[in-house]
Amino acid sequence: MKFDTVIMGGGLAGLLCGLQLQQHGLRCAIVTRGQSALHFSSGSLDLLSALPDGQPVTDITAGLDALCRQAPEHPYSRLGAQKVLTLAQQAQTLLNASGAQLYGDVQQAHQRVTPLGTLRSTWLSSPEVPVWPLSAQRICVVGVSGLLDFQAHLAAASLRQRDLNVETAEIDLPELDVLRDNPTEFRAVNIARLLDNEEKWPLLYDALSPIATNCDMIIMPACFGLANDTLWRWLNERLPCALTLLPTLPPSVLGIRLHNQLQRQFVRQGGIWMPGDEVKKVTCRHGIVSEIWTRNHADIPLRPRFAVLASGSFFSSGLVAEREGIREPILGLDVQQTATRAEWYQQHFFDPQPWQQFGVVTDDAFRPSLAGNTVENLYAIGSVLAGFDPIAEGCGGGVCAVSALQAAHHIAERAGEQQ
């Protein structure tokens, strides 16, 4: 099977890369093993929240300039501030075109409220998520009886520290009892599958309506809206106060929705989606990827003109830690890492951990190297890249988006030259 590009990994980076390549008229396939890290995320995307020295970032342009000085090997630093902002804006346009109407500005970070009621700087958020400063003084944090994925009293306690009048309440929906037989089934995603049925919408409205008359804003867990935000908008039009949603413990309704919107758009535009499959071997001849062998296709290789590695980091098995060191399991690409295991981590758990910055070594075009030699038609994007700390620096989503589009543009340019 011949393709212009085969992408190994169907997470945020892989999907955005595929969508951008389709804009250039290239035929793409995505091989994906299972759920991506988006399923376990908040559904919000960070661009740059903090510098390596710990200084918080609000002005993104100034932050990117400072990052170039502090971390010259960071994926952003390799591109330059203006290029990062341009690619981030293009990514936001792609996301909106896919139906993910995310709120945010590439020039200025905003503060979203977290499930614990604290604030976190971010780039893009779903319109349901409350953003600081809140537009209300009287707030009620509402939990769902029996739902362990969200603790209303913890969020309320944090918000009270910001001089807000915050109460808590709990709604009980007997219609959800069918899920209570097994505690592991009473999760936000399973509740959403039930409540998203239009016949159930009035039940949720009836439960929230008495609470809404005594406050200016309701904050509740994101336990509906798995496909779209239609129910949220329907409730906001009818309730006498604003309704906002907070992501819950994973799996996350907002994260799954974002992934599904991107995946559906990729397929709608003619992309080949290969779920439940796994790349077992890549044939590389004279520094060029010629064949990709997958578990489900056995002796039928995929033959791409270009290949993209978007396999993620440790969480997605894109990187594997062993006693001898860190390795990239598909091709055995060169990996940036510390010399000894003792240097992998810091003693204090909440300190920035060195292992977070481990990843494949690439050139400035994000082409990785194998035994010191660049693989000419292979690009590495997203969390598998080295040189950045997605947690401490708050840049995970941004690096995925920016590197994906940079690789896509580079591939499209080279593909045009070869025709």
Curated annotation (Swiss-Prot):
Its cofactor is FMN. It comes from the Bacteria. Keywords: Flavoprotein, FMN, Oxidoreductase. GO terms for cellular component: glycerol-3-phosphate dehydrogenase (FAD) complex. InterPro entries: FAD-dep_OxRdtase_2_FAD-bd, FAD/NAD-bd_sf, G3P_DH_GlpB_su. Its EC number is 1.1.5.3. Gene3D superfamilies: FAD/NAD(P)-binding domain (3.50.50.60). Pathway: Polyol metabolism; glycerol degradation via glycerol kinase pathway; glycerone phosphate from sn-glycerol 3-phosphate (anaerobic route): step 1/1. Signal peptide: none annotated. It catalyses: a quinone + sn-glycerol 3-phosphate = dihydroxyacetone phosphate + a quinol. It holds the Pfam family FAD_binding_2. The keyword Flavoprotein applies. It is an enzyme of class 1 (oxidoreductase). One of its GO terms (molecular function) is glycerol-3-phosphate dehydrogenase (quinone) activity. One of its GO terms (biological process) is glycerol catabolic process. Belongs to the anaerobic G-3-P dehydrogenase subunit B family. HAMAP family: Glycerol3P_GlpB (MF_00753). Conversion of glycerol 3-phosphate to dihydroxyacetone. Uses fumarate or nitrate as electron acceptor. Composed of a catalytic GlpA/B dimer and of membrane bound GlpC. This is Anaerobic glycerol-3-phosphate dehydrogenase subunit B. It comes from Salmonella choleraesuis (strain SC-B67).
